[in-house]
A protein has these predicted regions:
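Bacterial Sec-dependent N-terminal signal peptides
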Residues: 1-23
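Non-catalytic cap/lid and distal C-terminal segments of serine-dependent acyl enzymes
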Residues: 18-313
Length: 313
C-alpha cells in the first residue's frame, strides 16, 4: 500500500469499562480497504501497543467475517513507515484474493511489536522451560557471546497470548461483524512471529483453528554448535499440537540469509506433524528456493498461507 493518510474520524468504543478509541486510516491514492487504528490498546498483560484492524473496502455489518491475527503489525501495510522500507502488502494480497473469489471474507488484526521487547514477547515460554537449568545457563552464555538481547528471565509470551485471547479478541468479537469460533480464526507471523503462532495454536486450540508460520525462527536467537533450542520446540509440539481433524498448520522457509539456518531442522517439523496425524489436507511445509529472511520475500508468498487457511472449498 502507498503512504497511508489519516482521516480525522474518531470512533470510541467502551470495552470492559474502558474506552478504546480508534481512528481510520485510508489510502486516498489507491484504496485497498480501511484501517481502524488503536494507538495504545489498554492491557494488563503486556506493554500497551498499537493495533490496526484492516477491513476490506466492501466491509459490511450485514455479513460475517473470519479473522486473521498477525504479529509485527507495523510491517504489514505501509512501506513508507517501516524501518527497512519493506512491507507484507497484506491489504493488497487479501483484496486480490477476494476479487478472485479464492478466500472467505476476512479482516486482519495487526498487532504492532515494541522493538526492544519483541524477542521476549514472542519467544514461546513452555518449550524453553523444558530445558534443564544447566542447558538454559549454557544458552545464556551463548547469548552473551553474541551480545544478543535475550534474557530468559523476561520471556513474556504467555502474557502476550493472554492479551490476544482475553483482551484483544473479545474487543474484536464485540465491535466487528465476525465469526468468533476457532474454525474462522487464524494467526500468522514470520520468524519470531512464526514461533508465537505455533505456540498460540498449541496453547489455545479452542481459539485458533489455523496457524501460519513463515520462516519460523527455530534457532531461538542465532544458531550455534549443538544448539538445544530447536529440539525443545519439537518436543513441545509433539506433546501439544492440536487435533488435526479441525486444525490447519502451515510452515515455510527460504534458503538465503537467516533462513538458511532453518534448512537442517525442517525434517523434524515434518516428522512431528506427520506423527501427530497431519496430512496434506491440514498441513504444509514449503521450501522457497532463493528467498531470504525479509518482508519482501514473505510478501511474494503470503497468498499461499492465507488461501490455505481461508480458501473456499
Amino acid at each position: 500500500m502507498k503512504k497511508l493518510l489519516f482521516i480525522l474520524l474518531l470512533t470510541t468504543f467502551s470495552f470492559a469499562q474502558r474506552k478504546i478509541e480508534s481512528h481510520q486510516i485510508i489510502n486516498k491514492e489507491k484504496i485497498e480497504g480501511i484501517i481502524n487504528r488503536i494507538d495504545s490498546f489498554p492491557t494488563k498483560f503486556i506493554v500497551p501497543r498499537t493495533v490496526d484492524v484492516w477491513l476490506p473496502s466492501n466491509y459490511s455489518k450485514d455479513k460475517k467475517y473470519s479473522v486473521l491475527y498477525m504479529h509485527d503489525g507495523q510491517m504489514l501495510f505501509d512501506a513508507t513507515s517501516t524501518w527497512n522500507k519493506q512491507e507484507w502488502m497484506v491489504d493488497d494480497v487479501v483484496s486480490k484474493l477476494n476479487s478472485e473469489n479464492k478466500i472467505e471474507d476476512i479482516i486482519v488484526v495487526a498487532i504492532w511489536n515494541i522493538p526492544n521487547l519483541r524477542h521476549m514477547d514472542l519467544y514461546p515460554n513452555k518449550p524453553y522451560q523444558l530445558l534443564s537449568k544447566e542447558i538454559q545457563e549454557s544458552i545464556q552464555t551463548e547469548v552473551k557471546k553474541a551480545k544478543f538481547p535475550f534474557d530468559d528471565k523476561k520471556i513474556n509470551s504467555d502474557n502476550y497470548l493472554q492479551f490476544i485471547v482475553t483482551e484483544l479478541k473479545p474487543y474484536i468479537d464485540k465491535n466487528y461483524s465476525v465469526y468468533t469460533d476457532a474454525e474462522h480464526t487464524g494467526i500468522m507471523g514470520s520468524s519470531m512471529g512464526g514461533l508465537i503462532s505455533m505456540y498460540a495454536i498449541c496453547e489455545y486450540p479452542n481459539i485458533f483453528g489455523k496457524a501460519s508460520c513463515l520462516s519460523t525462527h527455530w534457532v531461538g536467537f542465532r544458531d550455534f554448535e549443538n544448539n538445544p533450542i530447536p529440539e525443545s520446540f519439537f518436543t513441545y509440539m509433539e506433546k501439544n499440537l492440536p487435533n488435526p481433524k479441525n486444525h490447519k498448520i502451515y510452515f515455510d522457509y527460504g534458503t538465503e540469509t537467516l533462513d538458511a539456518s532453518y534448512l537442517k531442522y525442517e525434517y523434524r517439523v515434518d516428522e512431528v506433524l506427520q506423527s501427530k496425524g497431519y496430512t496434506s489436507e491440514n498441513y504444509k511445509s514449503l521450501k522457497f528456493e532463493g528467498e531470504n529472511h525479509s518482508e519482501a520475500s514473505w510478501q511474494k508468498r503470503i497468498n499461499i498461507p492465507i488461501e490455505f487457511m481461508f480458501g473456499k472449498n
